[in-house]
From Swiss-Prot:
Plays a role in development of both male and female reproductive tissues. GO terms for cellular component: nucleus. The lineage of its organism: Eukaryota, Viridiplantae, Streptophyta, Embryophyta, Tracheophyta. This is Protein tesmin/TSO1-like CXC 6. Residues 293-319, 373-388, 508-539 have a biased composition (Polar residues). It comes from Arabidopsis thaliana. Its main location: nucleus. Residues 7-16 have a biased composition (Basic and acidic residues). InterPro entries: CRC, Lin-54_fam, Tesmin/TSO1-like_CXC. Belongs to the lin-54 family. Keywords: Developmental protein, Metal-binding, Nucleus, Zinc.
């Protein structure tokens, strides 16, 4: 009976616990398990499958409840923290896409030419909400920067959003990247390092002055693009066809640069420095062009009332023109005067010519050697015959044994020595410049053929260089003449034609007078005035001393009566 009573006590406990467990399951399904309910409705399960679903739940809960009754209260506790965590993360994720860059770049992302490390700002008074803050301008939050009182973070998102909106109202392109249409492919994917896609261009331009736009702090060079019209750099070398830029990207930078500098210095010293004048003319802005055009129009339409100030105004207009030319962003680009003269084909032809000349020199030298050897052989044969004759004479002297008044007979040893000395003297006299040995060498250990070839090649190369220098001088003179032609219109003075002024009518006759011109003239100007019907001419003093004077009357008047005078006579 005890076992039956115990068995009777267990079922109601299990029912109560199953109800609590079902309530907790419903709560879980209500909060986060709605997707499971929708999934069960969409599958259209049968009534038998629906009845089989609660049975495993009861079977699973029974051993857990029978083994440990107290922990049943703690089982529904773990799910609520997960739901709370999900709710807390939702408001943090929403505002991020509303930043200027919807896809923020990671700190260590590598872009074309940009450094791997993220730049850190050092703002102190702007709260990192101005465009000169690099983090704010790039649309990223400050992370590990050295800024003070920073508002460019998640905690101050409302203030940051307000600053972004106000900035966009003032300038819609404020958060646009500096380099438009830049290629995002890596440098390794390109054919050669330094080959630039021409679509990329800097929107604002660089302001380099001393680096030649070939350093990392030049934004155009850093992004691997060429400098454009927007740039305001000086002495730029980051343009298409720049030899310095090509040598920088194609290895052996220091050696190639040194060779180029030495070559340019030599060409400049031999020809001239007009290679710097081959740069395009300076560009003016629209406002400056309008101002310059107005100045020229004002000078061309000068009135006679301002004739006394003609010289000052013309000088002012000339100074304005010069000022406008200097204010424009002038790029002094060095281009060698021999850039379009010397070509690779010419260099190859020169090398072939030098090789041919060296071969001809060796051939002529061998021919000379053979001729010299023949001459030496003929001379040696003549010397042998002379030696035989000398021996015969000596033998005759020995046979005679006659002592002269001033001399006496010599011994045979002395005669032999004297004959050897004569033979050596004759040999040296026969070949003073040419050696008898076929393989003669110079004191430096070089063959005479090599020395002759070197001499001929150097002389030929010198003649070629002289021709190139003459061509460069001709081109330099043409460049200087063209530059003078460009400068002459600015220096020309404006010619002011004299304007005849109409004087008031006196006694029915118009009086005209010509004012003296401010320009250099050789003839004086005279004016005529008519008073009471008589024309009067008066000479104006000339500004320059002249030998001959020719009076020029400005006007001729004819006498005629006016209706006013006729009416008076009738009255």
């Amino acid at each position: 009976m005890g076992e039956g009573e115990e068995g009777d006590k267990f079922p109601p406990k299990t029912d109560e616990v199953t109800q609590e467990s079902m309530k907790s399951a419903r709560q879980l399904d209500f909060t986060g398990g709605s997707s499971d309910v929708e999934h069960s409705h969409s599958n259209q399960a049968s009534s038998m499958a629906a009845a089989s679903i609660p049975s495993p739940i009861v079977t699973v809960t029974r051993p857990i409840i029978t083994s440990q009754a107290p922990p049943t209260v703690a089982t529904p506790i773990p799910p609520p923290p997960q739901s709370q965590g999900i709710i807390l993360h939702v408001p943090i994720r929403h505002p991020r896409p509303e930043s200027p860059n919807s896809m923020p770049r990671p700190a260590g992302e590598t872009r074309d030419g940009t450094p791997q490390k993220k730049k850190q700002c050092n703002c102190k008074h702007s709260r990192c909400l101005k465009l000169y803050c690099e983090c704010f301008a790039s649309g990223t939050y400050c992370d590990g920067c050295n800024c003070v009182n920073c508002f460019n973070n998640v905690e101050n998102e409302p203030a940051r959003r307000q600053a972004v909106e106000s900035t966009l109202e003032r300038n819609p392109n404020a958060f646009r990247p500096k380099i438009a249409a830049s290629p995002h492919g890596g440098r390794d994917n390109r054919e050669e390092v330094g080959d630039v896609v021409m679509l990329a261009r800097h929107n604002k331009g660089c302001h380099c002055k001393k680096s030649g736009c070939l350093k990392k702090y030049c934004e155009c060079f850093q992004a691997n693009i060429l400098c454009s019209e927007n740039c305001k750099c000086l002495d730029c070398k980051n343009f298409e066809g720049s030899e310095v830029r090509q040598s920088l990207f194609h290895g052996e930078h220091s050696h190639n640069l040194a060779y180029l500098q030495h070559a340019n210095a030599a060409i400049t010293g031999a020809i001239g420095s007009s290679g710097f004048a081959s740069a395009p003319p300076p560009k003016r802005r629209k406002g400056q062009e309008i101002f310059f055009n107005q100045g020229t129009k004002d000078s061309s339409t000068h009135r006679l009332g301002q004739a006394n100030n003609g010289r000052t105004t013309s000088s002012q207009t000339g100074s304005r023109a010069g000022g406008n030319a200097s204010l424009g962003p002038s790029k002094v680009v060095y281009k060698s005067l021999l850039a379009n003269i010397i070509k690779p084909m010419d260099v190859k032809a020169l090398c072939s010519v030098l090789v041919a000349v060296a071969g001809e020199a060796a051939k002529t030298l061998t021919e000379k050697r053979l001729a010299n050897q023949k001459e030496t052989s003929v001379a040696s044969s003549v010397q042998d015959q002379g030696h035989v004759n000398n021996k015969a004479e000596k033998s005759g002297l020995e046979d005679s044994n006659a002592d002269g008044s001033k001399g006496r007979s010599l011994s045979p040893e002395t005669l032999a020595l004297m004959c050897d000395e004569r033979d050596t003297m004759l040999m040296v006299a026969a070949s003073p410049n040419c050696s008898v040995e076929p393989t003669s060498q110079l004191p430096n250990g070089q063959d005479q053929v090599y020395a002759e070839q070197e001499k001929v090649v150097l002389t030929k190369f010198r003649d070629c260089l002289n021709r190139i220098i003459s061509c460069g001088e001709v081109k330099e003179s043409n460049c200087s003449m063209s530059r003078m032609d460009l400068d002459t219109p600015v220096q020309t003075t404006v010619r002011i034609d004299p304007v005849v002024q109409q004087a008031p009518v006196a006694n029915g006759v118009s009086q005209t007078a010509k004012q003296p011109s401010q320009l250099n003239t050789t003839t004086p100007n005279t004016s005529s005035q008519t008073a009471n019907g008589v024309s009067q001419t008066a000479k104006q003093p000339s500004q320059l001393t002249t030998t001959t004077t020719t009076p020029n009357t400005s006007s001729q008047t004819h006498l005629h009566k006016t209706p006013a005078l006729s009416e008076k006579k009738d009255l």
